[in-house]
Protein backbone atom coordinates (compact mmCIF):
# COMPACT_ATOMS: atom_id res chain seq x y z
CA UNK A 1 0.00 0.00 0.00
CA UNK A 2 2.76 2.48 0.90
CA UNK A 3 4.62 1.85 -2.35
CA UNK A 4 1.45 2.84 -4.25
CA UNK A 5 1.26 6.16 -2.37
CA UNK A 6 4.87 7.25 -3.00
CA UNK A 7 4.31 8.60 -6.55
CA UNK A 8 1.55 10.87 -5.20
CA UNK A 9 3.37 11.99 -2.05
CA UNK A 10 4.96 15.34 -1.27
CA UNK A 11 8.69 15.37 -2.03
CA UNK A 12 10.94 17.89 -0.30
CA UNK A 13 14.44 17.99 1.14
CA UNK A 14 15.35 14.28 1.44
CA UNK A 15 11.95 12.79 2.25
CA UNK A 16 8.64 11.78 0.72
CA UNK A 17 5.44 12.28 2.71
CA UNK A 18 2.35 10.18 2.04
CA UNK A 19 -1.00 10.07 3.88
CA UNK A 20 0.23 7.15 6.01
CA UNK A 21 3.98 7.72 6.56
CA UNK A 22 7.02 9.88 5.96
CA UNK A 23 9.94 8.16 4.26
CA UNK A 24 13.33 9.71 5.04
CA UNK A 25 16.30 8.83 2.86
CA UNK A 26 19.45 8.44 4.98
CA UNK A 27 22.79 7.09 3.80
CA UNK A 28 21.60 4.17 1.63
CA UNK A 29 18.64 3.44 3.92
CA UNK A 30 15.04 4.56 4.20
CA UNK A 31 13.49 5.35 7.57
CA UNK A 32 9.69 5.00 7.61
CA UNK A 33 7.90 7.08 10.23
CA UNK A 34 4.15 6.35 10.47
CA UNK A 35 1.91 9.43 10.60
CA UNK A 36 0.46 8.28 13.94
CA UNK A 37 3.95 8.62 15.47
CA UNK A 38 4.54 12.24 14.36
CA UNK A 39 4.14 14.80 17.15
CA UNK A 40 5.88 17.98 15.94
CA UNK A 41 7.42 19.23 12.67
CA UNK A 42 9.59 22.34 12.76
CA UNK A 43 12.49 24.01 11.02
CA UNK A 44 15.78 25.54 12.08
CA UNK A 45 17.96 28.03 10.22
CA UNK A 46 21.67 28.35 10.99
CA UNK A 47 23.42 31.37 9.48
CA UNK A 48 27.10 31.13 8.59
CA UNK A 49 29.16 34.33 8.49
CA UNK A 50 32.72 35.31 7.73
CA UNK A 51 33.99 38.58 9.21
CA UNK A 52 30.38 39.38 10.14
CA UNK A 53 29.26 39.03 6.50
CA UNK A 54 26.57 36.38 5.87
CA UNK A 55 27.91 33.65 3.58
CA UNK A 56 25.19 30.99 3.72
CA UNK A 57 22.13 29.70 5.54
CA UNK A 58 21.46 26.06 6.41
CA UNK A 59 17.71 25.28 6.54
CA UNK A 60 17.02 21.99 8.37
CA UNK A 61 13.59 20.41 8.81
CA UNK A 62 13.04 18.27 11.93
CA UNK A 63 10.40 15.84 13.11
CA UNK A 64 9.77 14.85 16.74
CA UNK A 65 8.35 11.34 17.00
CA UNK A 66 6.27 9.56 19.63
CA UNK A 67 9.38 7.71 20.88
CA UNK A 68 11.03 11.04 21.73
CA UNK A 69 13.44 10.81 18.81
CA UNK A 70 14.20 13.87 16.71
CA UNK A 71 14.77 13.07 13.05
CA UNK A 72 16.19 15.35 10.39
CA UNK A 73 14.07 15.37 7.25
CA UNK A 74 16.87 17.02 5.31
CA UNK A 75 18.76 20.24 4.81
CA UNK A 76 18.90 22.90 2.11
CA UNK A 77 21.62 25.54 1.84
CA UNK A 78 20.94 29.02 0.48
CA UNK A 79 23.09 32.11 0.07
CA UNK A 80 23.75 34.39 3.02
CA UNK A 81 21.56 37.18 1.65
CA UNK A 82 18.88 34.90 0.22
CA UNK A 83 15.26 35.75 1.05
CA UNK A 84 14.10 32.22 0.18
CA UNK A 85 12.15 30.40 2.89
CA UNK A 86 12.26 26.71 1.91
CA UNK A 87 11.26 25.63 5.43
CA UNK A 88 8.01 27.58 5.37
CA UNK A 89 7.08 26.02 2.04
CA UNK A 90 7.97 22.47 3.15
CA UNK A 91 6.09 22.81 6.46
CA UNK A 92 3.02 24.19 4.64
CA UNK A 93 3.08 21.30 2.15
CA UNK A 94 3.33 18.77 4.97
CA UNK A 95 0.53 20.42 6.90
CA UNK A 96 -1.74 20.42 3.83
CA UNK A 97 -1.05 16.73 3.22
CA UNK A 98 -1.14 15.43 6.80
CA UNK A 99 -3.89 17.55 8.41
CA UNK A 100 -6.81 15.50 7.05
CA UNK A 101 -5.24 12.31 8.48
CA UNK A 102 -3.78 13.59 11.78
CA UNK A 103 -5.07 16.97 12.93
CA UNK A 104 -3.08 17.14 16.16
CA UNK A 105 0.45 17.40 14.73
CA UNK A 106 2.15 20.62 15.85
CA UNK A 107 3.82 22.65 13.08
CA UNK A 108 6.44 25.38 13.39
CA UNK A 109 8.83 26.37 16.15
CA UNK A 110 8.46 28.56 19.19
CA UNK A 111 10.18 28.47 22.57
CA UNK A 112 6.79 27.86 24.18
CA UNK A 113 6.22 24.71 22.11
CA UNK A 114 9.77 23.49 22.73
CA UNK A 115 9.41 24.00 26.50
CA UNK A 116 6.06 22.20 26.50
CA UNK A 117 7.45 19.13 24.72
CA UNK A 118 10.62 19.12 26.86
CA UNK A 119 8.84 19.72 30.16
CA UNK A 120 5.89 17.37 29.77
CA UNK A 121 6.50 15.03 26.86
CA UNK A 122 3.85 12.49 27.92
CA UNK A 123 1.27 15.28 28.24
CA UNK A 124 2.26 16.70 24.85
CA UNK A 125 1.81 13.28 23.23
CA UNK A 126 -1.62 12.95 24.85
CA UNK A 127 -2.56 16.43 23.59
CA UNK A 128 -1.53 15.59 20.01
CA UNK A 129 -3.41 12.28 20.16
CA UNK A 130 -6.53 13.94 21.60
CA UNK A 131 -6.57 16.67 18.94
CA UNK A 132 -6.06 14.03 16.26
CA UNK A 133 -9.22 12.23 17.41
CA UNK A 134 -11.38 15.36 17.10
CA UNK A 135 -13.74 15.42 14.10
Label every model-predicted segment.
Residues 1-19:
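Anionic N-terminal interaction surfaces
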Residues 4-5, 11, 26, 89, ...:
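Glutamate identity and glutamate-enriched acidic tracts
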Residues 10-12, 27-28, 64-70:
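Glycine-centered tight beta-turn/hairpin loop motif at sheet-sheet or coil-to-beta transitions
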Residues 14-56:
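Phosphoinositide-binding peripheral membrane targeting modules
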Residues 40-134:
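Acidic, Ser/Thr- and proline-rich intrinsically disordered linker/docking segments
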Amino acid sequence: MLDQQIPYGVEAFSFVATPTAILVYEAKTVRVIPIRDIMWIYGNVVKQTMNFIPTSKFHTLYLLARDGGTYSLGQITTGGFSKKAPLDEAVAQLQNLLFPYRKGIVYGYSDEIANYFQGNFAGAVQMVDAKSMEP
